[in-house]
């Protein structure tokens, strides 16, 4: 029986290292790795990609596009962890929980784009509500998110953790030009007709995301209530292994959101906070930016693709 060969192009970056750690020791696949001296050799990388059953690209956007262009073996399947192909026609979006058919689309695909960290939480909250008609596609959305500094990649981790490093600011807001590259991804896969505002920031901790989206009930159609929104999310994610929707009554009793609560896992926790008196609702998501927001999602997609590959020979 053929053992699938998996090659991680960019296995020394933050996401690549995490994927490698998650796959190491598995007997159902063979990890193809290049010697350190050959990792940046274009010819050796091209040979490795074209000899793999599945290639995981953990590269900057331009390098990911070049890697895909270098594939001449039609049997090679790709999971791209960069943002290069997340809105590209012909690529399947790698969020298995997007709808009932998405996991099967991923399983059968030859080109899968791994979701961005922030979009994972935003789309998971918004897509079911827009699809159900509870949230207008042109709602003037404001998305707020704080991530650990590992969201800035390997250079950011080294900058914060090297000996003698200056103390990091408690919070660093960025993307203030309102042109963050994740916005088109969020808009397309959440089904939005109006561009949302997105305000990200890095906290002085290593990893974990807390994302929130405020809603005014008076701007929703008909008599949509917090209970309607809650029921929609619960129904959409019923049976989802890696997505947990917190009960509404528990949310009301919670004092805060801990962005580090799910670190090390591939889980996503959604919660809805409501104040009926003020007619306001807060949608929230907590997850590991290196887990469900990156490497965990990539391995989840890989497992879906391996299942299809093994089932079909």
From Swiss-Prot:
Identification of the protein by name: N-acetyl-gamma-glutamyl-phosphate reductase 2
Subcellular location: Cytoplasm
Gene Ontology biological-process entries: L-arginine biosynthetic process
Primary location recorded for the protein, binned into one broad class: cytoplasm
Pathway annotation: Amino-acid biosynthesis; L-arginine biosynthesis; N(2)-acetyl-L-ornithine from L-glutamate: step 3/4
CDD domains, alphabetized: AGPR_2_C, AGPR_2_N
PROSITE patterns to which the protein is assigned, alphabetical: ARGC (PS01224)
GO MF entries: N-acetyl-gamma-glutamyl-phosphate reductase activity; NAD binding
Pfam family, one: Semialdhyde_dhC_1
PANTHER family: N-ACETYL-GAMMA-GLUTAMYL-PHOSPHATE REDUCTASE, CHLOROPLASTIC-RELATED, N-ACETYL-GAMMA-GLUTAMYL-PHOSPHATE REDUCTASE, CHLOROPLASTIC-RELATED-RELATED
């Amino acid at each position: 029986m053929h053992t699938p060969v998996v090659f991680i192009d960019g296995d020394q970056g933050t996401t690549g290292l995490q994927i490698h750690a998650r796959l190491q020791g598995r007997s159902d696949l063979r990890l193809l790795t290049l010697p350190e001296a050959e990792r940046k050799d274009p010819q050796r990388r091209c040979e490795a990609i074209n000899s793999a059953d599945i290639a995981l690209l953990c590269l900057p956007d331009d390098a990911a596009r070049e890697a895909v262009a270098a594939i001449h073996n039609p049997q090679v399947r790709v999971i791209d962890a960069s943002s290069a192909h997340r809105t590209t026609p012909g690529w399947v979006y790698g969020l298995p929980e997007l709808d009932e058919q998405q996991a099967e689309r991923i399983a059968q695909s030859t080109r899968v784009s791994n979701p961005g960290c922030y979009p994972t939480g935003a789309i998971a909250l918004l897509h079911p509500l827009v699809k159900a008609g509870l949230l207008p596609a042109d709602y003037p959305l404001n998305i707020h998110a704080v991530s650990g500094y590992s969201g800035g990649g390997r250079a950011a981790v080294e900058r914060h953790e090297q000996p003698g490093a200056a103390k990091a600011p408690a919070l660093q807001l960025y993307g203030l030009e309102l042109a963050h590259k994740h916005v088109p991804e969020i808009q397309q896969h959440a089904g939005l007709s109006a561009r949302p505002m997105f305000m990200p920031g890095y906290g002085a901790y290593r990893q974990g995301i807390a994302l929130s989206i405020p809603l005014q009930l008076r701007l929703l159609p008909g008599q949509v209530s917090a209970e309607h929104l809650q029921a929609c999310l619960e129904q959409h994610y019923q049976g989802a292994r890696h997505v947990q929707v917190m009960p509404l009554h528990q949310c009301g009793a919670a004092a805060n959101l801990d962005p580090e609560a799910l670190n090390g896992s591939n889980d996503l926790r959604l919660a809805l906070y409501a104040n009926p008196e003020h007619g306001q609702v807060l949608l929230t998501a907590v997850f590991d930016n290196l887990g469900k927001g990156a490497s965990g999602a990539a391995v989840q997609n890989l497992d879906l693709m391996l299942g299809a590959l093994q089932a079909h020979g």
